[in-house]
């Protein structure tokens, strides 16, 4: 059995795992892009860019629309290989797809949601920053930012050590600034501003904002001041206002998201991990209430019909593991064979909690302490549209379905219950 997992932060956070079955309604080759392109009626073109994150024992891929871990432009197969392999045909993947979901209510109670899954029905995200004045997306800007920028810690170290002489194309082309003539944010990708002129210029010594001096400085709330992470980093910008929300059928929020995917090369367990950071800006003129940030995960641990999912509440960790000691190769999918691993999905740091809300958001012994962050608040799953499952527990198709899954309810707004399949118990 295969389920879709949802981890949620109640900004708030959620982890959502989707559980699929054999046929799972995955997109056929080419279906996702063509079916979606016919439905997008707004200005920006669908996101197309992708880039591999492949530094340590993980080989995976991310897309400029915020979705990741699957081969959208190839054979629509899983693309999160552990261990990393040169020949993907011989590799075993532990996840099929993933994306960030965000939803909430405006002051009038109108639901606004942005999400991505398999692009079968459409998309809710487009590349590029938004106009900070009127929240609009410019098709030319979307096209310009339909790319993923890559940089490594080693090349920045070398740049600084050589006093700016050893400059690489990655450093030179780093998108440090938005276009203020188009009302974009002055700062875009994080960089160290040597002369404090707010303008990214490697010729004056500016560089992508790794902690080159290894100071590990923290701000007044105890958070790391460093803005760029990893030994290798991918950076991209996307928004939810570049067109009609054909994935969720929802109302756009006006979000600009600056994302990082990064990895470390180590000799311990971190060598089997990848990390993701999202800086979310609400560019609209309204406040979003009852807001949830969700990591949607279609986790396939090798062969996808013998997996279970679970949640460690204290750690805020969603996980997937094999149902038996042997993960077979079947239905064109490579399994892990003997001693299959488990895969975890964790929120290391959520958003800052509202001060004085009286809630122990980080589940420690203190309430409303300075710098308190929100940890995972929901863990849910749903079944793909295949098999004898109650229809209320299957794929979401409209905005309220997505929001219900993010907030711990089924599509019909009934709560998850204890025991069985968690529906109607």
Describe each region flagged by the PLM:
Residues 19-425:
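A long-range scaffold signal marking pre-active-site subdomains of enzyme folds
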Residues 1-24:
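Bacterial Sec-dependent N-terminal signal peptides
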């Amino acid at each position: 059995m295969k389920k879709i997992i949802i981890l949620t932060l109640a900004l708030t956070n959620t982890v959502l795992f989707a559980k699929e079955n054999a046929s799972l309604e995955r997109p056929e080759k080419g279906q996702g892009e063509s079916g979606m392109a016919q439905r997008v009626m707004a200005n920006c073109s669908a996101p197309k860019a992708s880039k591999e994150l492949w530094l340590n024992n993980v080989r995976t891929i991310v897309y400029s629309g915020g979705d990741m871990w699957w081969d959208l432009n190839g054979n629509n197969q899983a693309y999160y290989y552990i261990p990393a392999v040169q020949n993907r045909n011989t590799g075993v993947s532990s996840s099929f797809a993933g994306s960030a979901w965000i939803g909430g209510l405006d002051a009038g109670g109108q639901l606004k949601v942005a999400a991505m899954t398999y692009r079968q029905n459409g998309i809710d995200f487009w590349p590029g920053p938004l106009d900070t004045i009127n929240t609009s997306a410019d098709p030319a800007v979307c096209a310009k930012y339909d790319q993923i920028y890559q940089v490594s810690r080693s090349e920045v170290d070398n740049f600084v050590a050589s006093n700016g002489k050893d400059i690489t194309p990655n450093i030179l082309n780093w998108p440090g600034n938005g276009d203020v003539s188009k009302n974009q944010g002055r700062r875009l990708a994080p960089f160290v501003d040597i002369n404090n002129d707010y303008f990214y210029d490697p010729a004056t010594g500016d560089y992508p904002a790794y902690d080159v001096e290894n100071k590990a400085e923290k701000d007044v709330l105890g958070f790391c001041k460093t803005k760029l992470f990893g030994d290798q980093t991918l950076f991209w910008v996307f928004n939810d206002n570049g067109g009609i929300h054909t994935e969720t059928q929802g109302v756009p929020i006006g979000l600009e998201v600056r994302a990082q995917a990064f990895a470390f090369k180590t000799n311990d367990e971190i060598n089997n991990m990848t990390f993701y950071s999202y800086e979310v800006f609400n560019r609209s003129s309204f406040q979003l209430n009852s807001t949830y940030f969700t990591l949607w995960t279609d986790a396939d641990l090798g062969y996808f019909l013998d997996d279970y999912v679970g949640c460690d509440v204290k750690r805020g960790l969603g996980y997937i593991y094999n149902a038996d000691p042997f993960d077979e190769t079947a239905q064109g999918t490579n399994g892990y064979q003997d001693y299959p691993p488990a895969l975890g999905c964790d929120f290391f740091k959520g958003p800052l909690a509202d001060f004085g809300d009286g809630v122990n958001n980080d589940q420690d012994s203190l309430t409303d302490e300075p710098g308190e962050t929100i940890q995972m608040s929901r863990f849910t799953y749903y079944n793909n549209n295949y098999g004898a499952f109650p229809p209320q527990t299957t794929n979401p198709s409209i905005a309220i379905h997505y929001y219900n899954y993010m907030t711990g309810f089924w599509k019909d707004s009934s709560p998850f219950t204890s025991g069985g399949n968690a529906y109607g118990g």
